[in-house]
């Protein structure tokens, strides 16, 4: 089984061909492809983690959709002053499907 550890959106993700993962928003339109940076490649029994060997390895993903994460609520409160502040946030996300791993 071939899989790779890639850097995507400031995190490290374990991916194989056909996996769909959710990463932080990238400025790529839906249906287009993007390359993810591999940090480690496992090909059967061979494990590659050398940066010079990984320079030729490409992990290609296709953008499936743009999405938003769950809404979180931020509350600020100061005692005895009547100060209250409420704010919401939804993180913009991109769902990608891994199409190929290899040279």
From Swiss-Prot:
For the biological process aspect of GO, one term held by this record is: translation
Coiled coil as a keyword of this entry, yes or no, is no
For this protein, the record's InterPro entries field holds:
bL21-like, bL21-like_sf, Ribosomal_bL21, Ribosomal_bL21_CS
State one molecular function term (GO).
rRNA binding
Q: Does the keyword Ribosomal protein apply?
A: yes
One Pfam short name: Ribosomal_L21p
Which residues fall in a coiled-coil region?
none
Protein keywords = Ribonucleoprotein, Ribosomal protein, RNA-binding, rRNA-binding
Please tell me one Gene Ontology term that the record gives under cellular component: cytoplasm
Task: Share what the entry says about its subunit structure, partners included.
Answer: Part of the 50S ribosomal subunit. Contacts protein L20.
Name the job this protein performs: This protein binds to 23S rRNA in the presence of protein L20.
UniProt lists the family membership as follows: Belongs to the bacterial ribosomal protein bL21 family.
Name under which the protein is recorded: Large ribosomal subunit protein bL21
Name the species this protein comes from: Kineococcus radiotolerans (strain ATCC BAA-149 / DSM 14245 / SRS30216)
Taxonomic path: Bacteria, Bacillati, Actinomycetota, Actinomycetes, Kineosporiales
Give the gene name: rplU
């Amino acid at each position: 089984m071939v899989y790779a550890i890639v850097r995507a959106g400031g995190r490290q993700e374990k991916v194989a061909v056909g996996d769909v993962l959710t990463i932080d928003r990238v400025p790529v339109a839906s249906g287009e492809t993007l390359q993810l940076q591999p940090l480690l490649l496992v090909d059967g029994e061979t494990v590659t983690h050398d940066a010079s060997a990984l320079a030729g390895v490409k992990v290609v993903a296709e953008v499936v959709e743009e999405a938003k994460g769950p809404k979180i609520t931020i509350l600020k409160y100061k005692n005895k002053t009547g100060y209250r502040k409420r704010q919401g946030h939804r993180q913009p996300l991109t769902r990608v499907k891994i199409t190929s791993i290899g040279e």
